């Protein structure tokens, strides 16, 4: 039986921290689905198709990784995709408290789905998509924070929105 895991998130945009977790999950599981939440309460910079495209672009070196979008409950999506594990990255203790609540309700909704917490690499412990967008918005380099394709997409996005 294939070991399938889901790495869920908004990925707006995908960062080197996300990619680190995805690569490590890909080394453990037979298949990893990077699942982009469609109906997030956040107002995204990149639409779902753009985010899926960026994820696919930066994971081409990982043959067992795919990208997909989902709406609704994550555990229902996991069951549809026959995934037994949800992989979540943790940056700090503050992440753990929130993630533990989500993992607990997911377990209550579907006892067959486990949540695996992975500590992020310490060089990415401060990193979030929000921080990346804030830095990029002001024209500063994010080359050490995101893959090159994402940096290019951010530059284009902010040039368009600033009218340059």
From Swiss-Prot:
Enzyme class: transferase
EC number(s) stated in the UniProt entry for this protein: 2.7.7.3
Pfam families noted in UniProt: CTP_transf_like (PF01467)
InterPro entries attached to this UniProt entry: Cyt_trans-like (IPR004821), PPAT (IPR001980), Rossmann-like_a/b/a_fold (IPR014729)
Pathway linked to the protein: Cofactor biosynthesis; coenzyme A biosynthesis; CoA from (R)-pantothenate: step 4/5
Gene Ontology CC terms: cytoplasm
Cofactor: Mg(2+)
Catalytically driven reaction(s): (R)-4'-phosphopantetheine + ATP + H(+) = 3'-dephospho-CoA + diphosphate
Keywords per UniProt: ATP-binding, Coenzyme A biosynthesis, Cytoplasm, Magnesium, Nucleotide-binding, Nucleotidyltransferase, Transferase
GO BP terms, alphabetized: coenzyme A biosynthetic process
Cellular compartment(s): Cytoplasm
Main location: cytoplasm
Site (described: Transition state stabilizer): 18
A GO MF term: pantetheine-phosphate adenylyltransferase activity
Keyword ATP-binding on entry: yes
Binding site for ATP: 10-11, 18, 89-91, 99, 124-130
Annotated positions binding substrate: 10, 42, 74, 88
SUPFAM superfamilies: Nucleotidylyl transferase
NCBIfam families on file: coaD_prev_kdtB (TIGR01510), cyt_tran_rel (TIGR00125)
Description of how the protein assembles with itself and partners: Homohexamer.
Family: Belongs to the bacterial CoaD family.
Function recorded in the entry: Reversibly transfers an adenylyl group from ATP to 4'-phosphopantetheine, yielding dephospho-CoA (dPCoA) and pyrophosphate.
The protein, known as: Phosphopantetheine adenylyltransferase
Organism: Exiguobacterium sp. (strain ATCC BAA-1283 / AT1b)
């Amino acid at each position: 039986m294939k070991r399938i895991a889901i790495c869920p998130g908004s990925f707006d945009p995908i960062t080197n921290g996300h990619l680190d977790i995805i690569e490590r999950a890909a080394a453990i599981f037979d298949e990893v689905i990077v699942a982009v939440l469609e109906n997030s309460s956040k107002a995204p910079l990149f639409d779902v198709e753009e985010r899926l495209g960026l994820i696919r672009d930066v994971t081409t070196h990982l043959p067992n990784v795919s990208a997909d979008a989902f709406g609704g409950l994550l555990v229902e999506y996991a069951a549809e995709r026959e995934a037994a594990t949800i992989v979540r990255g943790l940056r700090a203790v503050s992440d753990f408290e929130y993630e533990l609540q989500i993992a607990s309700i997911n377990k209550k909704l579907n006892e067959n789905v486990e949540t695996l917490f992975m500590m992020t690499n310490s060089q990415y412990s401060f990193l979030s998509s929000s921080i990346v967008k804030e830095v990029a918005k002001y024209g500063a380099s994010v080359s050490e924070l995101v893959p090159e394709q994402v940096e290019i997409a951010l530059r284009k996005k902010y040039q368009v929105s600033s009218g340059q």
